[in-house]
């Protein structure tokens, strides 16, 4: 990975595995990195608690880049719009349009727009998000084409060149675990395994091999499968 120490990044940090890995990726690449979280009225607040533990844990590890301030914005308009299993107390199900009801329409578009506004104020020129087309549920605001178009729109909107980086766009969950290992070794993998939150049902409970969660929701299943694939590959490689 080539380093760009002169650039300053803002990482969208939710408290999950993907965004935590992206934070490590940014610290390995850029000279100065800040973090941004959103309280959007999500049903399960546990991911917001996990954010701070992840930040503290990442700060304790050695990185080429400097980890700067954390920022939190309240965006309760998404909960007001409702209709998603992420904001409303409803069972996870498929919608008539073929998308799961865990999709929060416009969420990533809004998050990146607010991130661009904050980056403008903070003198940051790179926005980093954990979106992926490889292991995802078809969310249209996670697509590479969507985010490339958004980069153009945001740069025009603030009259300043912004780069939207999505280092996991073409990586599977197994690849994401492998990337964390390359970036921060066993210490980072263990931090993400124990402190990040993925479960759609908000469960922490028992610590599984792959981390906390119910083990049955789509997010837990994807994370567990990725862990199993990655650890199996490591065993084959003698790691």
From Swiss-Prot:
Cofactor: record remark: Binds 1 zinc ion per subunit.
Cofactor(s) listed in the protein's UniProt record: Zn(2+)
Catalytic activity: 7-carboxy-7-deazaguanine + NH4(+) + ATP = 7-cyano-7-deazaguanine + ADP + phosphate + H2O + H(+)
EC category name: ligase
Family of this protein: Belongs to the QueC family.
Function of the protein: Catalyzes the ATP-dependent conversion of 7-carboxy-7-deazaguanine (CDG) to 7-cyano-7-deazaguanine (preQ(0)).
Alphabetical list of HAMAP family matching this protein: QueC
Listed name of the protein: 7-cyano-7-deazaguanine synthase
């Amino acid at each position: 990975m080539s380093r760009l120490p002169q650039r300053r990044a803002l990482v969208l940090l939710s408290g999950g595995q993907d965004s935590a890995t992206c934070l490590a990726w940014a610290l390995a690449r850029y000279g100065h990195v800040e973090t941004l979280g959103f309280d959007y009225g999500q049903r399960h607040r546990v991911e917001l608690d996990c954010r701070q533990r992840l930040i503290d844990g990442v700060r304790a590890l050695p990185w080429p880049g400097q980890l700067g301030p954390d920022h939190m914005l309240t965006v309760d308009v998404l909960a007001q719009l409702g209709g998603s299993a992420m904001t409303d107390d409803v069972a996870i199900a498929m919608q008539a349009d073929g998308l799961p009801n865990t999709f929060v329409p416009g969420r990533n578009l809004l998050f990146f727009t607010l991130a661009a506004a904050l980056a403008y104020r903070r003198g940051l020129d790179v926005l980093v998000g954990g979106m992926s087309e490889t292991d995802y549920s078809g969310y249209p605001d996670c697509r590479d084409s969507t985010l490339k178009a958004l980069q153009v729109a945001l740069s025009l909107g603030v009259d300043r060149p912004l780069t939207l980086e999505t280092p996991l766009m073409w990586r599977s969950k197994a690849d994401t675990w492998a990337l964390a290992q390359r970036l921060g070794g066993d210490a980072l993998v263990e931090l993400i395994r124990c402190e990040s939150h993925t479960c759609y049902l908000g469960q922490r409970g028992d610590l599984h091999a792959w981390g906390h969660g119910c083990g049955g929701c789509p997010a837990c299943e994807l994370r567990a499968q990725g862990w199993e694939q990655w650890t199996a590959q490591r065993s084959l490689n003698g790691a």
